[in-house]
């Protein structure tokens, strides 16, 4: 099955009360694990790729070809979108689209509102002409992801969210509502009131960044308010690192990378399967 945009899968998720996971790629093993877990659960999936991860893997084109090769060799038949996470500029979004990405996020949330609208509109025009879906962000998601650092959380303004959607024609919106990138210090406090208002006023599928560490009860509360995409990366990274440490600590003579990267891949796969079930994505592939 060819790569698809995430527009249709998120519309279906919003209409049918579940969420699609975006699981970030960091290397070959992450990609194998996420694709295999999703295929086994018969779940649509979004492969997130940050600019930093793309650089680590040599570039957007390499990432796309790796994903396409794995989909062929692993006989992947579920819908798969490949999505630029936190695109920093129009130029980066264009570069990803030209390399074969089927979805992009333009993160101009640090810019003044009118500038955010202007940049996002430019990305939407280029992307939609090529059948590529677009996500935008308002407010500030705290924590750190690659080169994107935010000291605190700035909640999205519901009126600005509605205006951004109307002026740009984006497909999905990531309003900052209390989640953070990376591990949480204490329990997250999500703005459900704002989430409900934004979901109702925009009519769009909403995105929850920083999905690691958010309690299941909060996930289940967020989905009926319009949250249709939940991003996960840190949890998979922690599971992977733990598996590698375990192998190396138990056997000081191990040097073959397959002996420790294999268990890391299995740990990621099990983590992703757990998230798929938690988000209600199992058996939703169409």
From Swiss-Prot:
EC top class, as a word: lyase
What InterPro entries does its record include? Aldolase_TIM, Class_II_FBP_aldolase, FBA_II, Fruc_bis_ald_class-2
What's the name of the protein?
A: Fructose-bisphosphate aldolase
PROSITE patterns, alphabetized: ALDOLASE_CLASS_II_2 (PS00806)
Q: Name one Pfam family in it.
A: F_bP_aldolase
Family, per the entry? Belongs to the class II fructose-bisphosphate aldolase family.
Q: Which catalytic reaction applies to this protein?
A: beta-D-fructose 1,6-bisphosphate = D-glyceraldehyde 3-phosphate + dihydroxyacetone phosphate
Chain's gene name? fba
Requisite cofactors: Zn(2+)
Active site, renumbered: 85
- The residues that hold dihydroxyacetone phosphate are 182, 210-212, 231-234
User: Membrane spanning segments where?
Assistant: none
Statement: the UniProt record of this protein carries the keyword Manganese? no
Enzyme Commission designation: 4.1.2.13
Cofactor info, note text: Binds 2 Zn(2+) ions per subunit. One is catalytic and the other provides a structural contribution.
**Biological-process GO terms, alphabetical:** fructose 1,6-bisphosphate metabolic process; glycolytic process
Which residues make up the binding site for Zn(2+) 1?
Answer: 86, 181, 209
Q: Where does D-glyceraldehyde 3-phosphate bind?
A: 50
An example molecular function term from Gene Ontology annotations: zinc ion binding
The alphabetical list of record keywords is:
Glycolysis, Lyase, Metal-binding, Zinc
Q: In which pathway does it act?
A: Carbohydrate degradation; glycolysis; D-glyceraldehyde 3-phosphate and glycerone phosphate from D-glucose: step 4/4
> Its function?
Catalyzes the aldol condensation of dihydroxyacetone phosphate (DHAP or glycerone-phosphate) with glyceraldehyde 3-phosphate (G3P) to form fructose 1,6-bisphosphate (FBP) in gluconeogenesis and the reverse reaction in glycolysis.
Locate the residues binding Zn(2+) 2: 107, 137
The keyword NAD is annotated on this UniProt entry:
no
């Amino acid at each position: 099955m060819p790569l698809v945009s995430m527009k249709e899968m998120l519309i279906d998720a919003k209409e049918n009360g579940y969420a699609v996971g975006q699981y970030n790629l960091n290397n070959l093993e992450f990609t194998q694990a996420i694709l295999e877990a999703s295929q086994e659960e018969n779940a649509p999936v979004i492969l997130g790729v940050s600019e930093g991860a793309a650089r680590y893997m040599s570039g957007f084109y390499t990432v796309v070809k790796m994903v396409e090769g794995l989909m062929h060799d692993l006989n992947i038949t579920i819908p798969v979108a490949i999505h630029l996470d936190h695109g920093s500029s129009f130029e980066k979004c264009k570069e990803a689209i030209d390399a074969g990405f089927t979805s992009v996020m333009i993160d101009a949330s640090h810019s003044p509102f009118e500038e955010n609208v202007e940049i996002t509109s430019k990305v939407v025009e280029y992307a939609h002409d090529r059948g590529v879906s677009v996500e935008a962000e308002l407010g500030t998601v705290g924590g750190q992801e690659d080169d994107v650092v935010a000291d605190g959380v700035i909640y999205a303004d519901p009126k600005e969210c509605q205006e951004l959607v109307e002026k740009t024609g984006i497909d999905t919106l990531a309003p900052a509502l209390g989640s953070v990138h990376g591990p949480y210090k204490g329990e997250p406090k999500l703005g459900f009131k704002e989430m409900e208002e934004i979901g109702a006023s925009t009519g769009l599928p909403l995105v929850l960044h920083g999905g690691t560490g958010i309690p299941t009860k909060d996930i289940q509360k967020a989905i009926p308010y319009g949250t249709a995409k939940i991003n996960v990366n840190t949890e998979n990274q922690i599971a992977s690192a733990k598996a590698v440490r375990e192998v190396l600590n138990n056997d000081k003579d191990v040097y073959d990378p397959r002996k420790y990267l294999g268990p890391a891949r299995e740990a990621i796969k099990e983590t992703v399967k757990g998230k798929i079930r938690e988000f209600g994505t199992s058996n939703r592939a169409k």
